[in-house]
Amino acid sequence: MARTIVGLGDAKAVKKFSGMLAVDVSREMYWERKFIGKGRTASAPIMQLTELENDAGELITYDLSMQLTQQPVEGDEVQEGTEEELKFYTDSVYIDQARGGVNGGGRMTRKRTLHNLRMVGKDRMSEWWSRMFDELIFIYMSGARGINADFIYPTTWTGRANNAITAPDSSHLHVAGGHAKGTLVADDKMSLAEVDSALVKVKAMGGGTGGIPKMKPIKINGELHYVLVMSTRQASDMRTAAGTGGWLDVQKAAATAEGRVSPIFKGGLGMYNNVVLHEHEAVIRFSDYGSGGNIGAARSLLLGNQAGALAYGSPGTGLRYDWHEEARDNGNVVIISSSCIFGFKKTTYNGLDFGVMAVDTAALKIS
Protein backbone atom coordinates (compact mmCIF):
# COMPACT_ATOMS: atom_id res chain seq x y z
CA MET A 1 0.00 0.00 0.00
CA ALA A 2 1.34 3.42 -0.92
CA ARG A 3 2.22 5.72 1.99
CA THR A 4 0.18 8.91 2.30
CA ILE A 5 2.35 12.04 2.41
CA VAL A 6 0.74 14.89 4.33
CA GLY A 7 2.08 18.11 2.81
CA LEU A 8 3.38 21.27 4.43
CA GLY A 9 0.55 23.35 5.89
CA ASP A 10 -2.05 20.61 5.43
CA ALA A 11 -5.19 21.71 7.31
CA LYS A 12 -5.74 18.36 9.03
CA ALA A 13 -2.12 18.15 10.16
CA VAL A 14 -2.20 21.73 11.44
CA LYS A 15 -5.35 21.07 13.48
CA LYS A 16 -3.98 17.79 14.81
CA PHE A 17 -0.65 19.20 15.95
CA SER A 18 -2.23 22.33 17.38
CA GLY A 19 -4.38 20.14 19.61
CA MET A 20 -1.50 17.85 20.52
CA LEU A 21 0.64 20.85 21.46
CA ALA A 22 -2.06 22.16 23.81
CA VAL A 23 -2.37 18.78 25.55
CA ASP A 24 1.39 18.41 25.94
CA VAL A 25 1.87 21.91 27.36
CA SER A 26 -0.86 21.33 29.95
CA ARG A 27 0.75 18.04 30.99
CA GLU A 28 4.24 19.53 31.31
CA MET A 29 3.37 22.87 32.89
CA TYR A 30 4.02 22.81 36.65
CA TRP A 31 1.34 25.34 37.59
CA GLU A 32 -1.26 23.78 35.30
CA ARG A 33 -0.86 20.31 36.80
CA LYS A 34 -1.35 21.41 40.39
CA PHE A 35 -2.58 24.91 41.01
CA ILE A 36 -4.94 26.15 38.27
CA GLY A 37 -8.73 25.90 38.45
CA LYS A 38 -11.21 27.00 35.79
CA GLY A 39 -13.62 29.85 36.36
CA ARG A 40 -14.15 32.75 38.72
CA THR A 41 -15.34 30.48 41.53
CA ALA A 42 -12.41 28.04 41.32
CA SER A 43 -10.94 26.94 44.64
CA ALA A 44 -7.32 27.00 43.53
CA PRO A 45 -4.27 29.26 43.79
CA ILE A 46 -4.81 30.45 40.20
CA MET A 47 -8.14 31.01 38.45
CA GLN A 48 -8.29 30.45 34.70
CA LEU A 49 -10.63 32.92 33.01
CA THR A 50 -12.18 31.68 29.77
CA GLU A 51 -14.42 34.54 28.61
CA LEU A 52 -12.14 35.61 25.76
CA GLU A 53 -11.56 32.11 24.39
CA ASN A 54 -14.75 32.53 22.37
CA ASP A 55 -15.30 36.31 22.36
CA ALA A 56 -13.32 39.25 21.00
CA GLY A 57 -11.41 41.56 23.32
CA GLU A 58 -8.12 41.98 25.14
CA LEU A 59 -9.19 42.67 28.74
CA ILE A 60 -11.02 40.69 31.41
CA THR A 61 -12.12 42.33 34.65
CA TYR A 62 -13.10 40.52 37.83
CA ASP A 63 -14.43 41.68 41.18
CA LEU A 64 -13.92 40.92 44.84
CA SER A 65 -16.90 41.44 47.12
CA MET A 66 -15.76 42.65 50.53
CA GLN A 67 -17.01 41.27 53.84
CA LEU A 68 -20.02 42.91 55.47
CA THR A 69 -19.26 44.99 58.57
CA GLN A 70 -22.73 46.11 59.68
CA GLN A 71 -23.99 45.58 63.20
CA PRO A 72 -27.09 43.39 63.49
CA VAL A 73 -30.51 44.89 64.03
CA GLU A 74 -31.73 43.64 67.40
CA GLY A 75 -35.24 42.80 68.50
CA ASP A 76 -37.95 45.11 67.17
CA GLU A 77 -35.58 47.85 66.08
CA VAL A 78 -36.36 49.16 62.60
CA GLN A 79 -34.13 47.58 59.95
CA GLU A 80 -35.12 49.92 57.13
CA GLY A 81 -32.21 52.11 56.10
CA THR A 82 -29.59 50.05 57.94
CA GLU A 83 -28.77 47.75 55.03
CA GLU A 84 -25.09 47.84 54.12
CA GLU A 85 -24.13 48.73 50.57
CA LEU A 86 -22.20 45.98 48.85
CA LYS A 87 -18.57 46.97 48.32
CA PHE A 88 -16.51 45.69 45.41
CA TYR A 89 -12.87 45.96 44.42
CA THR A 90 -11.97 45.33 40.79
CA ASP A 91 -8.89 43.93 39.06
CA SER A 92 -8.19 43.12 35.41
CA VAL A 93 -5.83 41.15 33.17
CA TYR A 94 -4.85 41.88 29.58
CA ILE A 95 -4.15 39.26 26.92
CA ASP A 96 -1.82 39.43 23.93
CA GLN A 97 -0.21 37.08 21.45
CA ALA A 98 3.11 35.31 22.06
CA ARG A 99 4.88 33.26 19.38
CA GLY A 100 7.76 30.84 19.02
CA GLY A 101 9.03 28.50 16.35
CA VAL A 102 11.65 26.09 15.08
CA ASN A 103 13.75 25.93 11.93
CA GLY A 104 13.92 22.44 10.42
CA GLY A 105 17.12 23.24 8.54
CA GLY A 106 17.97 23.19 4.85
CA ARG A 107 17.26 20.33 2.48
CA MET A 108 20.88 19.11 2.42
CA THR A 109 21.17 18.95 6.22
CA ARG A 110 17.63 17.82 6.99
CA LYS A 111 17.51 14.05 7.45
CA ARG A 112 13.95 13.75 8.76
CA THR A 113 10.59 13.47 7.04
CA LEU A 114 8.04 16.23 7.47
CA HIS A 115 6.07 14.06 9.91
CA ASN A 116 9.14 13.56 12.08
CA LEU A 117 9.92 17.28 11.94
CA ARG A 118 6.41 17.98 13.17
CA MET A 119 6.81 15.55 16.08
CA VAL A 120 10.21 16.90 17.09
CA GLY A 121 9.00 20.48 16.70
CA LYS A 122 5.94 19.76 18.86
CA ASP A 123 8.07 18.17 21.57
CA ARG A 124 10.53 21.06 21.69
CA MET A 125 7.84 23.74 21.55
CA SER A 126 5.73 22.09 24.26
CA GLU A 127 8.78 22.09 26.52
CA TRP A 128 9.42 25.73 25.64
CA TRP A 129 5.84 26.88 26.18
CA SER A 130 5.47 25.06 29.51
CA ARG A 131 8.80 26.39 30.76
CA MET A 132 7.93 29.91 29.64
CA PHE A 133 4.55 29.79 31.38
CA ASP A 134 6.03 28.43 34.62
CA GLU A 135 8.82 31.00 34.76
CA LEU A 136 6.45 33.83 33.88
CA ILE A 137 4.03 32.85 36.64
CA PHE A 138 6.82 32.66 39.22
CA ILE A 139 7.99 36.14 38.20
CA TYR A 140 4.53 37.71 38.37
CA MET A 141 3.56 35.99 41.62
CA SER A 142 6.87 36.99 43.22
CA GLY A 143 6.69 40.54 41.94
CA ALA A 144 10.32 40.37 40.80
CA ARG A 145 12.45 38.86 38.04
CA GLY A 146 15.32 37.96 40.39
CA ILE A 147 18.75 36.69 39.34
CA ASN A 148 17.77 33.24 38.04
CA ALA A 149 20.24 32.92 35.19
CA ASP A 150 18.62 30.14 33.18
CA PHE A 151 15.24 31.78 32.54
CA ILE A 152 13.84 32.43 29.07
CA TYR A 153 13.06 36.03 29.99
CA PRO A 154 16.17 38.19 30.71
CA THR A 155 16.86 39.81 34.08
CA THR A 156 15.78 43.14 32.59
CA TRP A 157 12.30 41.84 31.70
CA THR A 158 9.43 43.99 33.01
CA GLY A 159 6.36 41.97 31.98
CA ARG A 160 4.08 41.62 28.98
CA ALA A 161 0.63 42.48 27.61
CA ASN A 162 0.27 45.65 29.75
CA ASN A 163 0.22 43.52 32.91
CA ALA A 164 2.68 45.13 35.31
CA ILE A 165 4.95 43.09 37.58
CA THR A 166 4.21 44.50 41.03
CA ALA A 167 6.36 44.01 44.12
CA PRO A 168 4.67 42.60 47.24
CA ASP A 169 3.12 45.26 49.45
CA SER A 170 4.33 45.40 53.04
CA SER A 171 1.32 43.44 54.30
CA HIS A 172 2.11 40.55 51.96
CA LEU A 173 5.86 40.25 52.50
CA HIS A 174 7.39 38.19 55.30
CA VAL A 175 11.16 38.21 55.76
CA ALA A 176 12.67 35.44 57.90
CA GLY A 177 13.50 36.23 61.49
CA GLY A 178 11.27 39.28 61.48
CA HIS A 179 13.94 41.12 59.52
CA ALA A 180 13.84 43.39 56.50
CA LYS A 181 15.77 42.86 53.29
CA GLY A 182 18.70 44.94 54.55
CA THR A 183 19.01 43.15 57.88
CA LEU A 184 18.63 39.51 56.84
CA VAL A 185 21.54 37.32 57.96
CA ALA A 186 22.81 34.03 56.56
CA ASP A 187 21.24 32.02 59.40
CA ASP A 188 17.71 33.27 58.62
CA LYS A 189 16.88 30.11 56.69
CA MET A 190 13.60 28.43 55.86
CA SER A 191 12.11 26.36 58.67
CA LEU A 192 8.76 25.18 59.97
CA ALA A 193 8.90 28.05 62.46
CA GLU A 194 9.00 30.51 59.55
CA VAL A 195 5.90 28.85 58.11
CA ASP A 196 4.16 29.44 61.43
CA SER A 197 5.25 33.07 61.51
CA ALA A 198 4.07 33.75 57.97
CA LEU A 199 0.78 31.96 58.61
CA VAL A 200 0.11 34.07 61.71
CA LYS A 201 0.56 37.17 59.57
CA VAL A 202 -1.79 35.82 56.92
CA LYS A 203 -4.57 34.92 59.35
CA ALA A 204 -4.35 38.22 61.24
CA MET A 205 -4.53 40.33 58.10
CA GLY A 206 -7.55 41.89 56.42
CA GLY A 207 -11.28 41.71 56.76
CA GLY A 208 -13.40 44.00 58.88
CA THR A 209 -13.45 47.74 58.23
CA GLY A 210 -9.81 48.24 57.23
CA GLY A 211 -10.33 47.87 53.49
CA ILE A 212 -7.63 45.19 53.29
CA PRO A 213 -8.81 42.09 51.39
CA LYS A 214 -8.52 38.97 53.52
CA MET A 215 -6.33 36.20 52.12
CA LYS A 216 -8.56 33.15 51.77
CA PRO A 217 -7.42 29.53 52.07
CA ILE A 218 -8.12 26.86 49.47
CA LYS A 219 -11.11 24.71 50.42
CA ILE A 220 -10.75 20.98 49.71
CA ASN A 221 -13.30 18.45 50.98
CA GLY A 222 -14.22 20.80 53.79
CA GLU A 223 -10.59 21.33 54.84
CA LEU A 224 -8.85 24.69 54.51
CA HIS A 225 -5.31 24.70 53.12
CA TYR A 226 -2.56 27.00 51.97
CA VAL A 227 0.33 26.06 49.67
CA LEU A 228 3.99 26.99 50.13
CA VAL A 229 6.24 26.70 47.07
CA MET A 230 9.92 26.87 48.07
CA SER A 231 13.23 26.83 46.25
CA THR A 232 15.30 23.66 46.32
CA ARG A 233 17.66 25.23 48.88
CA GLN A 234 14.81 26.41 51.08
CA ALA A 235 13.28 22.93 51.09
CA SER A 236 16.65 21.44 52.02
CA ASP A 237 17.07 23.95 54.85
CA MET A 238 13.58 23.13 56.14
CA ARG A 239 14.27 19.38 56.16
CA THR A 240 17.54 19.91 58.00
CA ALA A 241 15.95 22.13 60.63
CA ALA A 242 13.03 19.75 61.16
CA GLY A 243 15.24 16.71 61.73
CA THR A 244 14.39 13.16 60.74
CA GLY A 245 11.49 12.74 63.14
CA GLY A 246 9.99 16.15 62.48
CA TRP A 247 10.17 15.69 58.74
CA LEU A 248 8.52 12.27 58.99
CA ASP A 249 5.59 13.96 60.75
CA VAL A 250 5.36 16.45 57.88
CA GLN A 251 5.16 13.62 55.36
CA LYS A 252 2.60 11.69 57.41
CA ALA A 253 0.36 14.75 57.68
CA ALA A 254 0.05 14.97 53.89
CA ALA A 255 -0.48 11.23 53.48
CA THR A 256 -3.42 11.22 55.90
CA ALA A 257 -5.08 14.50 54.88
CA GLU A 258 -8.71 14.38 53.77
CA GLY A 259 -7.90 16.24 50.57
CA ARG A 260 -4.79 14.26 49.64
CA VAL A 261 -6.23 13.35 46.22
CA SER A 262 -6.44 17.04 45.29
CA PRO A 263 -3.96 18.30 42.67
CA ILE A 264 -2.37 20.66 45.21
CA PHE A 265 -0.98 17.59 47.03
CA LYS A 266 0.54 16.00 43.90
CA GLY A 267 4.30 15.84 44.17
CA GLY A 268 4.22 17.65 47.49
CA LEU A 269 6.91 17.29 50.13
CA GLY A 270 4.42 17.04 52.96
CA MET A 271 2.07 19.20 55.01
CA TYR A 272 2.57 21.32 58.10
CA ASN A 273 -0.15 23.25 59.92
CA ASN A 274 -2.45 22.66 56.92
CA VAL A 275 0.12 24.22 54.58
CA VAL A 276 0.97 21.87 51.69
CA LEU A 277 4.71 22.09 51.01
CA HIS A 278 6.27 22.07 47.53
CA GLU A 279 9.62 22.87 45.96
CA HIS A 280 10.57 24.07 42.48
CA GLU A 281 13.81 25.16 40.86
CA ALA A 282 12.24 28.28 39.31
CA VAL A 283 11.46 29.98 42.62
CA ILE A 284 12.83 33.52 42.37
CA ARG A 285 16.29 34.10 43.88
CA PHE A 286 18.26 37.20 44.89
CA SER A 287 21.88 37.97 45.76
CA ASP A 288 21.67 41.39 47.44
CA TYR A 289 20.12 40.84 50.87
CA GLY A 290 21.72 41.67 54.22
CA SER A 291 23.50 44.78 55.45
CA GLY A 292 26.33 44.23 52.98
CA GLY A 293 24.04 43.41 50.08
CA ASN A 294 25.76 40.04 49.64
CA ILE A 295 23.39 37.50 51.23
CA GLY A 296 21.73 35.03 48.86
CA ALA A 297 17.96 34.79 49.33
CA ALA A 298 14.95 33.09 47.79
CA ARG A 299 11.30 34.12 47.70
CA SER A 300 8.96 31.24 48.47
CA LEU A 301 5.26 31.77 47.78
CA LEU A 302 2.60 31.14 50.42
CA LEU A 303 -0.51 30.77 48.29
CA GLY A 304 -4.15 31.03 49.16
CA ASN A 305 -7.21 31.01 46.94
CA GLN A 306 -7.18 32.86 43.60
CA ALA A 307 -3.76 34.44 44.07
CA GLY A 308 -3.32 34.82 40.31
CA ALA A 309 -5.43 35.16 37.17
CA LEU A 310 -4.65 33.42 33.87
CA ALA A 311 -6.67 34.31 30.78
CA TYR A 312 -6.58 32.88 27.27
CA GLY A 313 -7.87 34.16 23.95
CA SER A 314 -8.50 32.19 20.77
CA PRO A 315 -6.50 32.55 17.54
CA GLY A 316 -9.78 32.07 15.66
CA THR A 317 -9.40 28.34 15.12
CA GLY A 318 -11.29 27.25 18.22
CA LEU A 319 -8.01 25.92 19.63
CA ARG A 320 -5.75 27.45 22.27
CA TYR A 321 -2.59 27.26 20.18
CA ASP A 322 -2.14 28.19 16.55
CA TRP A 323 0.19 25.97 14.50
CA HIS A 324 1.80 27.32 11.33
CA GLU A 325 4.02 25.65 8.73
CA GLU A 326 5.78 27.27 5.81
CA ALA A 327 8.67 26.85 3.41
CA ARG A 328 11.32 29.52 3.00
CA ASP A 329 14.32 30.07 0.77
CA ASN A 330 12.53 28.76 -2.32
CA GLY A 331 11.25 25.71 -0.46
CA ASN A 332 14.66 24.75 0.93
CA VAL A 333 13.90 25.43 4.62
CA VAL A 334 10.92 24.22 6.68
CA ILE A 335 9.68 26.55 9.45
CA ILE A 336 7.16 25.44 12.08
CA SER A 337 5.81 28.02 14.51
CA SER A 338 3.14 28.22 17.19
CA SER A 339 1.35 31.03 18.97
CA CYS A 340 -0.90 31.54 21.97
CA ILE A 341 -2.99 34.51 23.11
CA PHE A 342 -2.85 34.83 26.89
CA GLY A 343 -2.24 37.06 29.87
CA PHE A 344 -1.32 36.53 33.50
CA LYS A 345 -1.06 38.65 36.61
CA LYS A 346 -1.06 38.45 40.36
CA THR A 347 -4.50 39.43 41.66
CA THR A 348 -4.56 42.78 43.44
CA TYR A 349 -7.52 44.60 44.95
CA ASN A 350 -7.52 48.11 46.38
CA GLY A 351 -3.80 48.30 45.54
CA LEU A 352 -2.95 45.25 47.67
CA ASP A 353 -2.05 41.66 46.88
CA PHE A 354 -4.87 39.25 47.52
CA GLY A 355 -3.90 35.59 47.65
CA VAL A 356 -0.12 35.38 48.04
CA MET A 357 2.37 36.10 50.79
CA ALA A 358 6.02 36.36 49.70
CA VAL A 359 8.25 34.59 52.23
CA ASP A 360 11.90 35.64 51.87
CA THR A 361 14.65 33.65 53.58
CA ALA A 362 18.39 33.33 53.27
CA ALA A 363 19.20 30.65 50.70
CA LEU A 364 22.75 29.91 49.69
CA LYS A 365 23.22 29.03 46.05
CA ILE A 366 23.47 25.29 45.40
CA SER A 367 26.68 24.70 43.45
Sequence positions of predicted segments:
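Residue-level detector of alpha-helix boundaries and kinks
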Residues: 47, 109-111, 321
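A generic local secondary-structure boundary/capping motif
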Residues: 50-51, 215-218
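Sequence/fold signature of self-assembling virion shell proteins
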Residues: 2-20, 30-35, 164-215, 225, ...
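N-terminal "assembly arms/tails" that initiate or stabilize quaternary assembly
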Residues: 1-95, 348-356, 360-367
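Generic structural motif
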Residues: 52, 65-71, 98-100, 105-107, ...
